[in-house]
Amino acid sequence: MDIVSLTWAALMVVFTFSLSLVVWGRSGL
């Protein structure tokens, strides 16, 4: 695995995590 795909994988993980956090927060937690 090269550095570019590794960076994209980390970016997608952070994006998905923050997005789910926002949705979870708006749900009224």
From Swiss-Prot:
<protein>
    <recommendedName>
        <fullName>Cytochrome b6-f complex subunit 8</fullName>
    </recommendedName>
</protein>
<keyword id="KW-0793">Thylakoid</keyword>
<comment type="function">
    <text>Component of the cytochrome b6-f complex, which mediates electron transfer between photosystem II (PSII) and photosystem I (PSI), cyclic electron flow around PSI, and state transitions.</text>
</comment>
<keyword id="KW-0812">Transmembrane</keyword>
<dbReference type="GO" id="GO:0009535">
    <property type="term" value="C:chloroplast thylakoid membrane"/>
</dbReference>
<dbReference type="InterPro" id="IPR036143">
    <property type="entry name" value="Cytochr_b6-f_cplx_su8_sf"/>
</dbReference>
<keyword id="KW-0472">Membrane</keyword>
<keyword id="KW-1133">Transmembrane helix</keyword>
<dbReference type="GO" id="GO:0015979">
    <property type="term" value="P:photosynthesis"/>
</dbReference>
<feature type="transmembrane region" description="Helical">
    <location>
        <begin position="3"/>
        <end position="23"/>
    </location>
</feature>
<dbReference type="InterPro" id="IPR005497">
    <property type="entry name" value="Cytochrome_b6-f_cplx_su8"/>
</dbReference>
<keyword id="KW-0150">Chloroplast</keyword>
<dbReference type="Pfam" id="PF03742">
    <property type="entry name" value="PetN"/>
</dbReference>
<dbReference type="GO" id="GO:0017004">
    <property type="term" value="P:cytochrome complex assembly"/>
</dbReference>
<dbReference type="GO" id="GO:0009512">
    <property type="term" value="C:cytochrome b6f complex"/>
</dbReference>
<keyword id="KW-0813">Transport</keyword>
<keyword id="KW-0249">Electron transport</keyword>
<comment type="similarity">
    <text>Belongs to the PetN family.</text>
</comment>
<comment type="subunit">
    <text>The 4 large subunits of the cytochrome b6-f complex are cytochrome b6, subunit IV (17 kDa polypeptide, PetD), cytochrome f and the Rieske protein, while the 4 small subunits are PetG, PetL, PetM and PetN. The complex functions as a dimer.</text>
</comment>
<dbReference type="GO" id="GO:0045158">
    <property type="term" value="F:electron transporter, transferring electrons within cytochrome b6/f complex of photosystem II activity"/>
</dbReference>
<keyword id="KW-0934">Plastid</keyword>
<keyword id="KW-0602">Photosynthesis</keyword>
